[in-house]
Regions:
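ATP-binding pocket architecture of kinase catalytic cores
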Residues: 2-121, 125, 132-137
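Short, polar/flexible loop-turn hinges at active-site or ligand-entry regions and domain interfaces
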Residues: 74-75, 148-150, 170-173
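Catalytic activation segment of kinase domains across protein kinase-like and atypical kinase folds
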Residues: 113, 125-166
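Active-site activation/catalytic loop segments of kinase-like enzymes and analogous catalytic loops
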Residues: 156-194, 210-222
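ATP/Mg2+ or Mg2+-diphosphate-binding catalytic cores
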Residues: 212-252
Length: 252
């Protein structure tokens, strides 16, 4: 038996044991496992297969692939990568549209104004994508802890925010983008993959940025845990800067 910590997740208590990911169980885990099981039965091969729950942990099948991390992988920084990300977002959205949660499902964002809309992943950033480096394509979408209801198009706008990227050059350079950043070309490519106009996508990005920021700001020290942690470290300040950047880009 091998037992190795999931890269970058040691503080979250995640370990990989013989091809199974063991993660601490949350009050949302049963709902997420029902969703993941449904995705598997629906033929969506990019999400982890649920492998059980007990009182302390959830278990998921490990997905082979290259974790994104920082800086962004060369492929995702290419126009083909932006187009592939847009197509992925559309495919994910189309599949999730058919899902119906189990009765009494509890998601991490459980109730309130921010828990409305179709079920979505909730955190589709490059950091949760796995890549097949040899084939140059997305081979996995992990960390479904923030799955649940969200405004229509939330996942697509969220991913576009970081793939295009809709943030200032300093923040983009921290993620590995090299000047000059071809935001016009990347936005066009992402929209080609997703299937809407650039103006419509920019509206989605701002909507996703604002929704994410509001989820953080309305969190309390009692939860939801992920948003409470982000609030504690001041991520909302960075998001507000990104919202301003995106709106200025829209107006230019």
């Amino acid at each position: 038996m091998t037992n190795s910590p999931g890269a970058g997740f040691v503080d979250r208590g995640i370990v990989i044991v013989d091809g199974v990911v063991r993660r601490p169980r949350g009050y949302w885990s049963a709902a997420v496992h029902d969703l993941l099981g449904w995705l598997d039965r629906a033929g969506f091969s990019l999400s982890p297969k649920p492998a059980g729950l007990d009182e302390q942990f959830e278990y998921l099948q490990y997905i082979e692939g290259t974790g994104q991390g920082w800086p962004l992988l060369p492929f995702i920084q290419s126009l083909d990568g932006a187009r592939a990300a847009g197509a992925f977002a559309r495919n994910l959205e189309s599949i999730l549209a058919a899902y119906r949660p189990i009765k009494g499902a509890r998601w991490q964002l459980d109730g309130g104004a921010h828990a409305r809309g179709p079920i979505q992943h909730g955190d589709v950033g490059p950091w949760n994508l796995l890549w097949d480096s040899a084939r140059g394509e997305i081979c996995g979408l992990i960390d479904w802890d923030l799955a649940g209801p969200a405004p229509a198009g939330y996942d697509a706008g969220f991913l576009a925010w970081f793939v295009i990227p809709m943030m200032d050059d300093f923040r983009a350079h921290e993620r590995g983008f090299v000047s000059p950043i071809d935001r016009v070309g990347r936005l066009r490519a992402y929209c080609d993959g997703y299937g809407i106009t650039r103006g419509e996508m920019l509206d989605l990005i701002v909507s996703s940025q604002e929704e994410f920021c509001n989820r953080i700001l309305t969190a309390s020290e009692h939860g939801p845990p992920t948003y409470a942690m982000l609030k504690e470290v001041g991520i909302d300040e960075l998001i507000r800067k990104d919202i301003l950047f995106t709106r200025q880009y829209q107006a230019s």
